[in-house]
Amino acid sequence: MSCLAALTKFHEIYKAAFVERLGELPRCFTHGRPSPCLADDALAGSEEPQPWQMVPRREVAVFNNVSHAMDIELHHDIDDFYGHLFGGPLQFDSPWGEGELIQIWNEDDFVLLQQNILGHLMMKKQLKQPQTWFVGLIGDVDEMVSVNNADGTVWREVAGQEPHEQLAESLEAFLQQLKPRVAPPQYHQEPAATVNPHPGIFASLKRMWQNLTGR
């Protein structure tokens, strides 16, 4: 099974878990932002959490611009994980605790993600640490779930530090160990100066970056 197949399967299991437990689709706060994955009866402009479901992209999105900017070859799993689907944030339970996976809400969201990953890669280069890119958060102390770009292994990582605990040999293997967490949607408060808030977890990633850089 590929990373994309494992992610698609988790989306399907995630949706089924909400339908079985709550009788409805997963919901998230949209911050007024439209998305192809919003359900037909959703109201993008509402302040209330709205129902969503995974939708395949018509064209695959890639990270060639980030690779070019950093002059590195990014591990192919990054395109599989981020480039094929639109979806809301995925809350999970795992052998290592609760967490949340980043997913792409709309096209603008993908651009924001590229900027965040580029900033993360630049930080790793500046600190002379192994290159990683993130796919989510885990635990209650804002640790990242990151992928080692050299070999595709999955790790826990604190911003500004080297990864400290390997979670899986691959992103595919990591995804296969997750279980959907059926829980109320989380409202992620963005700093006041931020434009285009993300319905998922970029607020937490931004906070980690600000704590590291003092900005």
UniProtKB/Swiss-Prot annotation:
This is Protein Syd. Transmembrane segments: none annotated. The keyword Cell inner membrane applies. The keyword Cell membrane applies. Its main location: membrane. Pfam families: Syd. Interacts with the SecY protein in vivo. May bind preferentially to an uncomplexed state of SecY, thus functioning either as a chelating agent for excess SecY in the cell or as a regulatory factor that negatively controls the translocase function. The gene is syd. It is a peripheral membrane protein. GO terms for cellular component: cytoplasmic side of plasma membrane. It is found in: Cell inner membrane. Keywords: Cell inner membrane, Cell membrane, Membrane. Belongs to the Syd family.
